[in-house]
Curated annotation (Swiss-Prot):
Residues 57-91 are cytoplasmic. The chain crosses the membrane at residues 34-56. The keyword Mitochondrion does not apply. Keywords: Early protein, Host endoplasmic reticulum, Host membrane, Membrane, Signal, Transmembrane, Transmembrane helix. Down-regulates the EGF receptor. It holds the Pfam family Adeno_E3B. Belongs to the adenoviridae E3B family. Residues 22-33 are lumenal. It is a single-pass type I membrane protein. GO terms for cellular component: host cell endoplasmic reticulum membrane; membrane. It comes from Human adenovirus A serotype 12. Residues 1-21 form the signal peptide. This is Early E3B 10.4 kDa protein. The lineage of its organism: Viruses, Varidnaviria, Bamfordvirae, Preplasmiviricota, Tectiliviricetes. It is found in: Host endoplasmic reticulum membrane.
Length: 91
């Protein structure tokens, strides 16, 4: 689970950097107006999706660790072994 979250945290950086690298070599004076607007739309959509992905994954990442910290701090007599196994915690 942690590796999946870390991969999803890296995806926005990869998407943004690859999009900006691809667009940085373009010369807008040589392109038709429609192509420039299409590229601008693509870059904007990529940035918005990257920000949304980063936000959602960050919330999941913090929630993942917050649940484990709260569960470990809870009084030991209330800790359920089945829940600990579900959270993959060591007793």
């Amino acid at each position: 689970m942690v590796t999946v979250l870390l991969i999803f945290l890296c995806l926005p950086v990869i998407f943004s950097s690859s999009t900006f690298a691809a667009v940085s070599d373009l010369d807008p004076e040589c392109l038709a107006p429609f192509a420039v607007y299409l590229i601008f739309t693509f870059v904007t959509a990529t940035c918005v999706c990257s920000i949304i992905t980063l936000l959602i994954t960050s919330l999941q990442f913090f929630d993942y660790y917050y649940v484990r910290i709260v569960y470990r701090r809870h009084h030991p007599r209330y800790q359920n072994p089945q829940i600990a196994a579900l959270l993959q915690l060591q007793p």
